Amino acid sequence: MNDADIHKELFQHTKELADHYLLNTYARYDVAFRYGVNELLFDFDNKQYIDFHCGVAVTNLGHADPDIIEVVRSQADKLFHTSNLFYSEEASKLAELLILNSFPGKVFLTNSGTEAIEGAFKLARKYAYSKSIVDPIILSLEKSFHGRSVSGMSLTGQDKIRKGYGELLKGIEFIEPNNDEALVAAFERYQGRIVALIEEPILGESGIIPLSRNFLTLSRELTEENEALLIFDEIQTGMGRTGTLFAFETMGFSPDAMTLAKGLGSGFPIGALIVGEKYQDLFTQGSHGSTFGGNHLAAAVAYETIRIIQTREILNNVNICSDIAFTRLREMQEKYPVISEVRGKGLHIGLELKVPSKPIAEACLSAGLVVNATADNVVRIMPPLTISTDFLNQGLDILESVLKQN
């Protein structure tokens, strides 16, 4: 048996195990990756792929970053986990770094974005209770995505995510994104009952839909006027994805709370809820918790991730590569009628098509490019923040060759 046959057999065995033992909750592509190096992935046959996906905006520093590997090894030699019933040098240092680079307040560390959203939801409920609001309302946006837990689904403005589970949590109302009049009307309709407004600065799962500056500014003004929390879900936009460490930095104001995950741990599971000073005392001892959240290993990796972003000119590379990507994609839009819109910010890019995006993503994969198909007709482009301009252009060449045929 030659190497190709061995690799094919290994991959087939992997598929059979997955199909037999894993719940059928994912529509997987017909490939398994064995290793990666920065912006490149390699499958069982050692075929090379340029990664424009980053595990859904997770591996922002690429694959197998040497400094991340060293921190994992070093911390694993010392301590994985004790619990949050004891002080942790790694968690304390990470919390300090997050606050110094966001806004004054305190941090709750989690294992995932969904758990960070759960914390934000409980924060809003705690706030309602503290104000004796009997029938509180949390505003969210249509087309939003906030996770797969019951609270996350309840906050998510997409029927396809919510369906099949019966009645979800009450007290959540949805408004159209970037509709200033609808936002004002909601605050008027539920005056005295709104305790929070939660927003993704760029709606990711619905196809990279940026919220306008006017809408975001109005959101801040209305929440302040009505003494409601403004919660930003930066799980996907955070950690340098849009060209700044956090997307809110370019807005001229801060939210009252912010959720993080994905790129925070460079692929190691960790999330965070940052709560501003005004609301940080709503959580008291015993009112919230996590067994694994922010354990020694996860916190050490997250700290190193932020340090790397701040010391390696990563954000400068994001802005350079973003200019290249948007220029080329808009040139493609002029040439190929199949493209209806190019949108996004930094290396968080959506390519809206006039045809379904799944076949496009599959064709790209066959040609050696990993992209994400979302919202039925959007190709989501999220390469590592460390990608070289050479591989960026090679990936865009592959994408263009696929679009030419459609």
Swiss-Prot record:
Coiled coil: none annotated. It is found in: Cytoplasm. GO terms for cellular component: cytoplasm. Pfam families: Aminotran_3. Pathway: Amino-acid biosynthesis; L-arginine biosynthesis; N(2)-acetyl-L-ornithine from L-glutamate: step 4/4. Keywords: Amino-acid biosynthesis, Aminotransferase, Arginine biosynthesis, Cytoplasm, Pyridoxal phosphate, Transferase. Its EC number is 2.6.1.11. Binds 1 pyridoxal phosphate per subunit. It catalyses: N(2)-acetyl-L-ornithine + 2-oxoglutarate = N-acetyl-L-glutamate 5-semialdehyde + L-glutamate. GO terms for molecular function: identical protein binding; N2-acetyl-L-ornithine:2-oxoglutarate 5-aminotransferase activity; pyridoxal phosphate binding. Pyridoxal 5'-phosphate binds at G113, T114, F145, D233, E234, I235, Q236, T291. The modification N6-(pyridoxal phosphate)lysine is found at K262. Transmembrane segments: none annotated. May also have succinyldiaminopimelate aminotransferase activity, thus carrying out the corresponding step in lysine biosynthesis. This is Acetylornithine aminotransferase. It comes from Leptospira interrogans serogroup Icterohaemorrhagiae serovar Lai (strain 56601). The gene is argD.
